Amino acid sequence: MIFSELTTAEIETKVKALKEELFNLRLQLATGQLENPTRIREVRKAIARMKTVVREREIGINR
C-alpha cells in the first residue's frame, strides 16, 4: 500500500486502528497466545511509515 496516496485524515484513522492492533498483539504476547510474533514488527513499521508521510506533508517535503 502506498501511504502517500491517502489523505492525512485517512492515514490518522489507519494509525489509530494499527495502534489498537499493536496493543492487542502485545497483550497476546504477554499471555502467550501470539501466533505470529513478526506481526508486531510489521505493525510498528507501518505506523512509522504513515507518521513519516504525515510529517513530510507538514514540513513540505515531496517524494
From Swiss-Prot:
InterPro entries documented for this protein: Ribosomal_protein_uL29, Ribosomal_uL29, Ribosomal_uL29_CS, Ribosomal_uL29_sf
Ribonucleoprotein as UniProt keyword: yes
Keywords carried by this UniProt record: Ribonucleoprotein, Ribosomal protein
Any Pfam family: Ribosomal_L29
GO cellular component term of the entry, any: cytosolic large ribosomal subunit
Taxonomic superkingdom: Bacteria
GO molecular function, one term: structural constituent of ribosome
Annotated GO biological process: translation
Gene3D superfamilies: 1.10.287.310
UniProt-listed PANTHER family: 60S RIBOSOMAL PROTEIN L35/50S RIBOSOMAL PROTEIN L29, LARGE RIBOSOMAL SUBUNIT PROTEIN UL29C
Family: Belongs to the universal ribosomal protein uL29 family.
Protein name listed in UniProt: Large ribosomal subunit protein uL29
Organism name: Bacillus cereus (strain ATCC 14579 / DSM 31 / CCUG 7414 / JCM 2152 / NBRC 15305 / NCIMB 9373 / NCTC 2599 / NRRL B-3711)
The organism's taxonomic lineage, starting at the top: Bacteria, Bacillati, Bacillota, Bacilli, Bacillales
Gene behind this protein: rpmC
